[in-house]
From Swiss-Prot:
Function: Cell wall formation. Adds enolpyruvyl to UDP-N-acetylglucosamine.
Class in the EC hierarchy, top level: transferase
Entry GO terms, CC: cytoplasm
SUPFAM superfamilies: EPT/RTPC-like
Organism this protein belongs to: Lactobacillus johnsonii (strain CNCM I-12250 / La1 / NCC 533)
Substrates-to-products reaction catalysed: phosphoenolpyruvate + UDP-N-acetyl-alpha-D-glucosamine = UDP-N-acetyl-3-O-(1-carboxyvinyl)-alpha-D-glucosamine + phosphate
Active-site residue list: 116 (proton donor)
Protein name: UDP-N-acetylglucosamine 1-carboxyvinyltransferase
Length: 421
């Protein structure tokens, strides 16, 4: 197990560069096996999830070469093999192999997916999509077995009951080489969907409407990667550093961002009174003055991202007066970080899955646990604000989602280390 040790209370300043989007990367890597030629991904974040996905690729005899931020994937000798449940359970996003394997081989056998414990995240919409394309889906011995008919997958009209990012991506990957046209209605509109579609289109796919609620896919015979693909910047990492800069920054510039991907989040941060200057691809966050409380309500994109409700919580604690309210409409039970913040002296409560935040003028270090990625980010920010030493157990969860986090925090002046225990 990894621990993050933070000696907090020190103002941070300087520059930080945002890595490639985790939520794109964990789909693009499985999608690479759809190509008949080697794939090059640029701007790949150095996160544990990437290492885990490369391990899964090695199970299929797919060669990977990861140098700095460039990942080369060679599927020339790929073999169709079941993916082990143990590794799948440690990485929820590995469910993207369902769509990729089904699209490439007409069959996928994967262990039940795992990942962060933030409440129910059923894959029923993924299965509904696969079945609409003609596949059969079975659950056997902790495995999901998805099989295309002998005549191959056929395009279909698929209406999602909610705009699920995972289901949208999986259906795109499964249908990109299906016969005929596939239409996804009520599709997710996140930037990462557009990134996946761009990647596949550059390999010869025909995908239109990504980023809107209706996506149309015309099946093609095969896909071949021709040019490197640069992954979009991580809007969740960027939003986390915006909160950090406002909480305890003494002037921080955040590079490699796409501002429009953060519109809803930045509007809320600025509503609190944080002053931000935006350039073409960077943000400068000024030291915060007196801030006011706000209400945050998460929603599907382009609304306030559920992955940013926890990182913004320490910033709410710094407000001078009033009561802040956080309502997560996407994952209402995403409140596991609240008892941990209370250990640090935070005046914060949960009532019926609604988070109530009150001004807290002093946080103290404590021994806390990161139950999942974004809860870990929240506790990390609180630890940087707090006086004394904070020890975050299960810090591996933070490393799953944040590119070179220890190095980046140190460059801003933080006293932080990650150790194995």
């Amino acid at each position: 197990m990894k621990q993050m040790i933070i000696h907090g209370g020190k103002p941070l300043k300087g520059d930080v560069w945002i890595g490639g989007a985790k939520n794109s990367t964990v789909a693009l890597i499985p999608a690479s096996i759809l190509s008949r030629t080697p794939v090059t991904l640029e701007g790949v974040p150095r996160i544990a999830d990437v290492d885990n996905l490369m391990d899964l690729l090695s199970e299929m005899d797919v060669k990977c070469d990861f140098h700095e931020t460039t990942l080369r994937i060679n599927p020339d000798n790929i073999k169709r093999s079941p993916l082990p449940a143990g590794k799948i359970k440690s990485l929820r996003a590995s469910y993207y192999f369902m769509g990729a394997l089904l699209g490439r081989f007409g069959k996928a056998v994967v262990g039940f997916p795992g990942g962060d414990d933030i409440g129910p995240r059923p894959i029923d919409q993924h299965i509904k999509g696969f079945e609409a394309l003609g596949a059969t889906v079975e659950n056997k011995n902790d495995q999901i077995i998805i099989t295309a008919p002998k005549t191959g997958l056929r395009g279909a009209k698929i209406h999602l009951k909610m705009p699920s990012v995972g289901a949208t991506m999986n259906i795109i990957m499964a249908s990109v080489m299906a016969k005929g046209q596939t239409i996804i209605e009520n599709a997710a509109k996140e930037p990462e969907i557009i990134d996946l579609a761009t990647f596949l289109n550059n390999m010869g796919a025909v995908i239109r409407g990504a980023g809107t609620e209706v996506i149309r896919i015309e099946g093609v015979e095969e896909l071949k990667a021709q040019t490197p693909h640069t992954i979009i910047p991580d809007r969740i990492e960027a939003g986390t550093y915006v909160a950090l800069a406002a909480c305890i920054g003494n002037g921080i510039r955040i590079h490699n961002i796409i501002e429009e991907h953060l519109d809803s989040y930045l509007a809320k941060v600025e509503e609190m009174g944080v002053v931000i200057d935006a350039d073409e691809d960077s943000l400068y966050v000024y030291p915060a003055g007196d801030l006011k409380m706000i209400q945050v309500r998460t929603d599907v994109y382009p609304g306030f991202a559920t992955d940013l409700q926890q990182p913004i919580t320490p910033l709410l604690l710094t407000a001078k007066s009033g009561e802040g309210v956080v309502i997560d409409q996407i994952y209402p039970k995403r409140v596991g970080h609240i008892p941990e913040l209370q250990k640090m002296g935070a005046n914060i409560q949960v009532e019926d899955n609604i988070i109530l935040v009150h001004p807290t003028h002093h946080l103290h270090g404590a021994h806390v646990s990161a139950g999942e990625i974004r809860a870990g980010a929240c506790l990390m920010l609180a630890g940087l604000m707090a006086d004394g030493e904070t020890i975050i157990s299960n810090a591996g969860n933070i490393l799953r989602g944040y590119d070179r986090i220890e190095q980046k925090l140190r460059q801003l002046g933080a006293e932080v280390s990650v150790i194995d225990v």
